[in-house]
Amino acid sequence: MSITKDQILEAFAEMSVMEVVELIEAMEEKFGVSAAAAVVAGGAEGGAAAAEQTEFDVMMTSFGANKVAVIKALRGATGLGLKEAKAMAESAPVAVKEGLEKAEAEALKAELEAAGAEVEIK
């Protein structure tokens, strides 16, 4: 008499976690295999996509046509003085803020783009 897959699954369902761990270890030893997840070799971006980014940098690539509005937006977002904000705008491409959460980075990007700047999030 052979045991069906359903019977095996039912037996697993009735086991405690420790019993399942012991069973897996015994199966690894018996069959010479490992229950570790297989690592799939992908492209260079495959690993980066798997680990989701949690910190973002807002980079201004250009201040666009409306430099005054961009300087005002930079002052409001960073707390810089007029001279420092003007220097930042003129030194584009420049990191406006670094290590932001995604929502904060998106909001800052929208604010600077509304003022006329060209902005990227990295």
From Swiss-Prot:
A Pfam cross-reference name: Ribosomal_L12_N
Keyword Ribonucleoprotein among record annotations: yes
GO terms for cellular component: cytosolic large ribosomal subunit
Family from the record: Belongs to the bacterial ribosomal protein bL12 family.
Gene3D superfamilies according to UniProt: 3.30.1390.10, Single helix bin
Molecular function via GO: mRNA binding; structural constituent of ribosome
InterPro entries xref list: Ribosomal_bL12, Ribosomal_bL12_C, Ribosomal_bL12_C/ClpS-like, Ribosomal_bL12_oligo, Ribosomal_bL12_oligo_N_sf
Organism annotation: Shewanella woodyi (strain ATCC 51908 / MS32)
Keyword set includes Transcription regulation: no
Role played: Forms part of the ribosomal stalk which helps the ribosome interact with GTP-bound translation factors. Is thus essential for accurate translation.
Protein name in the entry: Large ribosomal subunit protein bL12
HAMAP family: Ribosomal_bL12
UniProt-listed PANTHER family: 39S RIBOSOMAL PROTEIN L12 (PTHR45987), LARGE RIBOSOMAL SUBUNIT PROTEIN BL12M (PTHR45987:SF4)
CDD domains on file: Ribosomal_L7_L12 (cd00387)
Keywords on record: Ribonucleoprotein, Ribosomal protein
BP term (GO), one: translation
Subunit structure comment from the entry: Homodimer. Part of the ribosomal stalk of the 50S ribosomal subunit. Forms a multimeric L10(L12)X complex, where L10 forms an elongated spine to which 2 to 4 L12 dimers bind in a sequential fashion. Binds GTP-bound translation factors.
